[in-house]
């Protein structure tokens, strides 16, 4: 079993028009990941809830007009911000501008999201309930520079947000960082998205080059790791489910 490595443009295209684009990056049952681009003025999702999974967003560029909670409180989500919406919280979003919006969307567990996009099945999504659902305060919103930051000798690890079904971390490394030795997991999907720098992703006995915008996912049992060619690197690291990973980082 090999990890998956692709660029956003290589993801399975559900929509690809000048004004909007959506591509599937990962469709494992434990973690669905998509990449989306919306031109200014494009509508995103009407207010809704999920009963059984977390809906997460990481904004790569632009500004997302997010609305959450019983009162649909507005939250301006700028580039570098993570949002994790737990089950039972009403949420919706649009791109009110200025400019283009690009973001990653996480569903953990998947609960049929990519099958819904492919028009192959039902999805864990409901209209807002009569009681308004859970409070907006239950949503995790981590702005750029926020989160739990742990400074190591050759890197900084920041827990941007974590729930039992998903944790999202930011890994920022110095040129002397040697990487992550090959390993595997049996209880989670371990995924990375390159924000800055050049990365060597281990796939079996080979090392594949990953530039900014590359996505790398190791499903359970897949041997994976990272090599640093010698530069500064910034990576998102997504674990679905968390499976104790955030607490392990805190304990180091």
Question: What is the role of each PLM region?
Answer:
Residues 92-140, 225, 229-252:
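Double-stranded beta-helix
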Residues 29-30, 52, 71, 98-99, ...:
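Short strand-connecting beta-turns/loops that link adjacent beta-strands
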Residues 29-31, 39-43, 63-64, 110, ...:
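Short, charged/polar surface micro-motifs in flexible loops or helix N-caps
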Residues 29, 67-71, 153, 164, ...:
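Short strand-coil-strand connectors
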Residues 45-47, 66-67, 75, 85, ...:
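Short beta-strand His + acidic residue motifs that chelate non-heme Fe in jelly-roll/DSBH
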Residues 71-87, 205-220:
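Short acidic-glycine-tyrosine-enriched beta hairpin
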Residues 1-34, 40, 46, 118-167, ...:
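A short, N-terminal "cap"/entry segment at the start of jelly-roll beta-barrel domains
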């Amino acid at each position: 079993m090999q990890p998956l490595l692709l660029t956003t443009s290589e993801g399975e295209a559900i929509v690809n028009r000048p004004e909007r684009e959506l591509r599937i990056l990962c469709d494992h049952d434990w973690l669905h990941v998509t990449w989306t681009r919306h031109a200014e003025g494009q509508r995103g999702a009407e207010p809704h809830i999920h009963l059984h999974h977390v809906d997460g967003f990481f904004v790569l560029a632009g500004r997302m007009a997010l609305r959450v909670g019983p009162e649909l409180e507005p939250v301006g989500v700028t580039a570098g911000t993570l949002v994790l919406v737990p089950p039972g919280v009403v949420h919706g979003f649009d791109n009110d501008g200025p400019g283009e919006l690009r973001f990653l969307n996480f569903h953990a567990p998947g609960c049929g999201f990519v099958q819904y996009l492919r028009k192959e099945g039902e999805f864990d999504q409901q209209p807002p309930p009569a009681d308004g659902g859970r409070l907006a305060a239950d949503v995790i919103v981590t702005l750029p520079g926020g989160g739990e930051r742990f400074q190591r000798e050759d890197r900084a690890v920041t827990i941007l947000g974590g729930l039992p079904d998903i944790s999202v971390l930011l890994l920022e490394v110095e040129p002397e960082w040697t990487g992550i030795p090959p390993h595997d997991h049996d209880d989670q999907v371990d995924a990375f998205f390159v924000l800055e720098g050049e990365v060597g992703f281990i796939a079996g006995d080979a090392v594949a080059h990953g530039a900014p915008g590359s996505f790398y996912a190791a499903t359970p049992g897949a041997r994976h790791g990272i090599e640093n060619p010698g530069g500064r690197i910034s990576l998102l690291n997504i674990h679905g489910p968390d499976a104790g990973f955030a607490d392990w980082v805190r304990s180091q």
